[in-house]
């Protein structure tokens, strides 16, 4: 990272005894992840399966640049901030719905003894503490849940959030977050709350947490540009493909997640389980709670100091409103050319069965849709391969 130091200020005041000191720093940082991608079985504008060869940005990590900084306030207390932009390197367009700082934007206070409090647009505690113990942390979107129905790929951020992060006490750490809906006369409308904890000892780590987001109390709160959907919440929606696209007008989303990881020499193994529930009300357009039970496993091998290879498997079962089942196998390799630049090759195969609901409200045979991508297949299977480069600065 390149640092822009707003370095130590030493002010000698004429006629005043003593010197005032303030330690400050600001860091400019970023990341560009670009690839050539091949997809077998993705629908075209006519709804027919075709093969696709295209440029795709953000396989392992989303493209970004940002500023983060600290100011020493004395007595172990610091002020902190972070402003992080997401963008598409292929088009130069802003990500996260065109927001200038759509990935993160917060300010807060931190102390070694009591922890950190931050306010603004942030990741929830499951993203901070549970996701690092899953396959997505190593190989990104190709290794994540179909449709990202449990936000394992960090597709959702939360606005208006107040978050507390504890210090690490003997390997234990926890986070709690609450986001205000900001609706006059309806305090809970649009609110989000979440909590998670993690514990690490030696080669073993475990984490668990819960997330709940409300989509507003009225039909008007869920309607934008004439479309009813996930518009009334402080948290972003994750409805980019056919796996869960029919549930964008849900009253609420609840996600419970647990993960554990073990590191033995060059091997890293982890397991995870999530339960995501999309609950309806009279304004939702579907009648029964849609439930997704997700189980995932990952094995990584650090073949050399520069080379990581990994394999992942995810089982996703829908119930309640639909009956779809998704089996997904992913393979990946990542090679470091330097401390800041790496090249990678990732691929996945997915098979779908049962039925899923469409955005039009009908039940149809389930179609495959790998990871958190927006590639919908008109058939039960899909394959994908991406060859890319990532540079951090």
Which role does the model predict for each range below?
Residues 379-393:
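Outer-membrane beta-barrel "beta-signal"
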Residues 1-22:
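Gram-negative bacterial Sec-dependent N-terminal signal peptides
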Residues 48, 56-62, 98-102, 153-157, ...:
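Transmembrane beta-barrel outer-membrane domains
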Residues 23-38, 53-184, 189-212, 348-352:
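Outer membrane beta-barrel
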Residues 61-65, 103-107, 158-162, 193-195, ...:
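Hydrophobic, lipid-facing positions within transmembrane beta-strands of outer-membrane proteins
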Residues 50-53, 93, 148-149, 181-182, ...:
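Extracellular loop and loop/strand-boundary signature of outer-membrane beta-barrel proteins
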Residues 196-332, 348:
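Detector for outer-membrane/organellar transmembrane beta-barrel domains
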Residues 68-72, 110-112, 165-168, 198-202, ...:
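Structural signature of outer-membrane beta-barrel channels/translocons
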